[in-house]
C-alpha cells in the first residue's frame, strides 16, 4: 500500500477555496466600464476568466462577474465604495448617473464589510485565512464548518437551501456570500432584504488557480489585500503539480457527497476535475 504525502499548506489552501472538499472579462488594460460608469484601470488577472475588477482611483472599485452559464452575458456587478463622508458623496453621484437599463444586477457595497452571513464553508475558511473572521456574523450549513472559533461564536442561519430569514435579519449583515446556481430563478426572500448578495461563482472558473484568484475580490470586500496569500498558493500549487507528474497514476479519489438521492460528481473540465488531473489522480 502506497503512502502519499501531501503538502499541508497547499492542502489547507485547497480546502478553504472549496477545491479539495470542496469575465469572460469585459476588457483589458484601460477599461471603460459599462452603464455610464467612469473609465478606470483594470486590475490584472492571471488565471480568473469570469472576474474583472476596475479601479477608479481611491473613490471606488467596480467588480464585474461574467455569467459562466451564458456566454457573453453578465452575472452581477458590484460597486465597492469606502465608508465615510466622501464615500457617501460617491454613492450619490454614481446613483444619479447609473443607467436604468443596466445589463445585469448592480449592488453598491460599502467597504470594509464588518458583518456578513456566509453560506459556504470554503469561504468561511478563506475569510479566516485573510484575517477577517470577525466579520462573519452568521453561517449556513454550520455542520460543514470545521473552524472551532467560528462554530462557537457565529449564529447558525440554517441550511443554505432554506436559510432562516428571521435570524439573518436580526444580524443586520452588510453582505451575504452565497453560492449561485444555474437557472436558480433568484434568491427568493433573500432578494427582498435589500442586502447586497455576493454571488460567489468562483467554483465555475476554468482552473483551480482561476478559482483561487477570486480571493482578491473577496479580500477587497473586507479591506484585506489577498495578493500575498494568492502568490504563496500559486507557487505551492505549481510546485506540487510538477511533483505529481512524476508519480505513478492510478490513485482513486472519492469526491463530493450525496445530496438527497443524488451523488453529484465533478466534470472533467471543472475546477475539481482539473485539480485531480493536476494531482495525477
Residue ranges of model-derived segments:
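A short, structured surface patch at a secondary-structure boundary
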Residues: 69-170, 174-180
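Alpha-helical, coiled-coil/dimerization segments enriched in small aliphatic residues
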Residues: 142-145, 204, 265-281
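Extracytoplasmic substrate-binding proteins
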Residues: 164-167, 174-177, 183-264
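Short, solvent-exposed loop/turn and secondary-structure capping segments
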Residues: 127-131, 187-190, 266-268
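Bacterial Sec-exported substrate-binding components of ABC uptake systems
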Residues: 26-121, 225-254
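Short, structured coil segments at secondary-structure junctions
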Residues: 132, 153, 193-194, 279
